[in-house]
């Protein structure tokens, strides 16, 4: 069978092109335009760069390129402080100066609202910057594997792969976690524990989890295993506790299923306690190994205050906090509201939320286990706060909100695309978008958090 003849000048996969980078895509890649009109996505490229790139994959209307060399560097390009930044898949923007990162994130939110939400002039404020663009992460989870020599390695996955890039330290995480990373790696090497092989679903150690209270300094270390016991793990855990003064606990999480989920359903404490405490907006929260808590405490505090300001609750009003987690938004909301009702499908988070309310002496909060669409119709909801996962709200949740007819909705989102989609539905249902405030919780990455406020028309 004879293939279709290639037109003169046609671009082919594997070909090298020199292109100017004009923008950043929502996923963090640089964007260029090929001579045939197709969009080219180039990982690691910065607007203002001119790069020589290999066409590694071509589709009908777009393609993907790999940088071979930077012909001319953008004025926004800087030297990445991390020695493995170009290989590690955790950070996409370490080589972009921070002010330009913030501009790009604001543009990303605005364009999502315009193109996906249909808002002509969306009221998007400048992004609230992180005071420390490095060393801000209060949580890290590292896959554990073996290198080509069979030695244990701990690090992050290389972009678009499951090859582990070994790390001695991570400049994005709180530097107080770096010694724990080094100690865990040495412990795994000396103990000779078996390492999980995801291809054959064999071996014990899968992940290492680290947490720290930014304000309290308390640290927690968790080994994730594939259901197998680790010889000598309890005395090893106690030795870690004795070595590090602020290490309050060492835990073992069991995860026996295949797949990319990091933690399994069972966690037990090997030494010390199974939680750290953190202070946010004047409240004290207990955080366990698998608890969801924003990865930058100082920015999470700003987020909580923005939500409370957007809700603008009075002593006569009830606020429903949908997807409430452990109550990090509920408790600050309770200062002004008559009552706050938190809804959360994860039962352990509901138990923790109730515990956090008790610890802080909050009596006008109650927490319900279940789905928003099932529970909201039976509740008084003068104001609704939603903080869904990246996929956004299910259609049934949006319909439940509209049927509750709250006077105000505050929507917290980590995904501008699903935020735009859901705001479009709420506005069509009778609400007016008052404002969108992006907050940078994820410096050196393309991710951005937003707080959107809507009022009933």
From Swiss-Prot:
Pfam families: TRAM, tRNA_U5-meth_tr. Disulfide bonds: none annotated. Keywords: 4Fe-4S, Iron, Iron-sulfur, Metal-binding, Methyltransferase, S-adenosyl-L-methionine, Transferase. The active site is at residue 414. One of its GO terms (molecular function) is rRNA (uridine-C5-)-methyltransferase activity. Residues 10-69 form the TRAM domain. [4Fe-4S] cluster binds at residues 82, 88, 91, 170. SUPFAM superfamilies: Nucleic acid-binding proteins, S-adenosyl-L-methionine-dependent methyltransferases. CDD domains: AdoMet_MTases. S-adenosyl-L-methionine binds at residues 294, 323, 344, 387. Its EC number is 2.1.1.-. The keyword Mitochondrion does not apply. One of its GO terms (biological process) is rRNA base methylation. The keyword ATP-binding does not apply. PROSITE patterns: SAM_MT_RNA_M5U (PS51687), TRAM (PS50926), TRMA_1 (PS01230). Belongs to the class I-like SAM-binding methyltransferase superfamily. RNA M5U methyltransferase family. PANTHER family: RNA M5U METHYLTRANSFERASE, TRNA (URACIL(54)-C(5))-METHYLTRANSFERASE. This is Uncharacterized RNA methyltransferase gll3134.
């Amino acid at each position: 069978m004879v293939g279709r003849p290639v037109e003169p000048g046609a671009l082919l996969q594997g070909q090298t092109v020199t292109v100017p980078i004009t923008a950043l895509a929502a996923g963090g890649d640089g964007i260029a335009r090929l001579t045939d009109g197709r969009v080219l996505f180039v990982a690691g490229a910065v607007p203002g760069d001119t790069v020589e790139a290999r066409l590694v994959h071509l589709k009908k209307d777009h393609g993907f390129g790999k940088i071979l060399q930077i012909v001319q560097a953008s004025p926004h390009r800087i030297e990445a402080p991390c020695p493995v930044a170009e290989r590690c898949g955790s950070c996409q923007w370490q080589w972009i100066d921070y002010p330009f990162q913030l501009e790009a994130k604001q543009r990303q939110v605005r364009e999502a609202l315009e193109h996906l939400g249909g808002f002509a002039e969306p009221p998007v404020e400048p992004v609230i910057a992180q005071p420390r663009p490095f060393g801000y992460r209060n949580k890290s989870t590292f896959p554990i594997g073996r290198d080509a020599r069979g030695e244990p390695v701990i690090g992050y996955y290389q972009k678009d792969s499951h090859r582990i890039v070994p790390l001695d330290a991570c400049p994005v995480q709180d530097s107080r976690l770096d010694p724990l990373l080094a100690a865990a790696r040495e412990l795994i090497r000396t103990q000779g524990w078996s390492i999980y092989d995801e291809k054959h679903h064999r071996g014990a150690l899968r992940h290492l989890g680290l947490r720290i209270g930014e304000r309290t300094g308390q640290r927690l270390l968790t080994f994730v295993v594939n259901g197998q016991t680790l010889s000598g793990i309890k005395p090893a855990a106690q030795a870690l506790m004795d070595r590090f003064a602020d290490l309050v606990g060492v835990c073992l999480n069991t995860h026996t299923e295949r797949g990319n989920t990091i933690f399994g359903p069972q966690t037990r404490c090997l030494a010390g306690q199974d939680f750290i405490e953190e202070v946010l907006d004047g409240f004290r929260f207990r955080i366990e190994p698998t608890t969801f808590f924003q990865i930058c405490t100082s920015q999470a505090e700003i987020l909580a205050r923005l939500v409370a300001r957007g809700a603008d609750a009075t002593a006569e009003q009830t606020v429903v906090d949908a997807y409430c987690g452990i109550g990090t938004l509920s408790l600050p909301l309770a200062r002004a509201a008559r009552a706050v009702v938190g809804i959360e499908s994860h039962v352990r988070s509901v138990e923790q939320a109730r515990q956090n309310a008790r610890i802080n002496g909050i009596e006008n909060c109650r927490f319900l286990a279940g789905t928003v669409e099932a529970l909201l119709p039976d509740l008084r909801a003068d104001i609704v706060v939603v903080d869904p996962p990246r996929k956004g709200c299910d259609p049934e949740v949006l319909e439940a909100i509209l049927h509750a007819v709250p006077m105000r909705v505050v929507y917290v989102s980590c995904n501008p695309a699903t935020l735009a989609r859901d705001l479009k539905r709420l506005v069509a249902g009778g609400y007016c978008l008052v404002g969108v405030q992006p907050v940078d919780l994820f410096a050196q990455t393309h991710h951005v958090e937003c707080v959107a406020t809507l009022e009933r028309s």
